[in-house]
Amino acid sequence: MKVLRLVNSAHFGLSRKIGSINQALVLLGMSELKKLVITSGIISVMPELPNMNIEDFWLGSFRTATYAKWLAEESKLENSEMLFTAGLISNLGNILIHLGNPVAAQEINKYIEAGDSRPDSERQQLGYTNQEVCAELCHRWQFSNDLIDAIDKSGEPLAFKPISLPACAIFVAKYISDFNNKDEEQFLADFPVKEWQQLGFNEQDIAEKVAIILDLDTGLEGLLD
Amino acid sequence: MKSEIHQLFNHIDNVPQVPEVVRTLVSQASNPNVSLMKLLKMLKKNKLFQ
């Protein structure tokens, strides 16, 4: 789980071993180093839960973060680094719901497995969504209002006016991140085209750009060892 | 905040607290004026980097 160990792992393919933060900064750059420290720090404070596969949870979060950053850069949004962090933590509300109300969390999962939408199931069982819970956690962590707003609206970005483009990026990133759970035909049929178009992309480019996104390497899996 | 969300947080024994270095790095993303030297100093002291 330590950043230095990951930096020295085969993934980064560095020709020599790094022993200090200054070396890491020179070889990786500040942006990459920040990503590793933020991700490692957030993983370190979140508990493991007996009824939740936490490794799958984090792998999904790594993908959402990486895809949200890519979408932000491609659509020329101002703050792609913020979108990485927002994507990374956008699902933490689910962990808090499991911690604070495990019975409702199990019920919500049953409704979703039966075909209901997550926002509807959460509102029915709890009166709020996991994104609202995550937004409150970010507020307590004193994160920026931009980040809190993006997460708060990321469950249903088109339901808010004006439409938040960062929220659209997180929503689309999360959808693509969950690709493993769907067959390709279903994936394209349910694709969030309106949110995609809000980001300035064309509907006919979905297959081509999604193939690029799915090829992105998060480079963060080593933080779970 | 909705009162129901407040209740949820009240039911969690230890609400996770984010490390100071993470808070600073996240806020730095939207504040380019944070000094690089200050960040380096903070990272050097932080056990996450060891």
Language-model-detected regions and their locations in the chain:
Chain A
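Conserved alpha-helical "signature site"
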Residues: 1-88, 92-103, 117-190
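Juxtamembrane helix-loop transition sites at the ends of transmembrane segments
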Residues: 50, 111-112, 163, 195, ...
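Post-HEXXH active-site segment of zinc metalloproteases
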Residues: 102-113
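Terminal helices and disordered tails flanking the catalytic cores of nucleotide-processing hydrolases
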Residues: 193-225
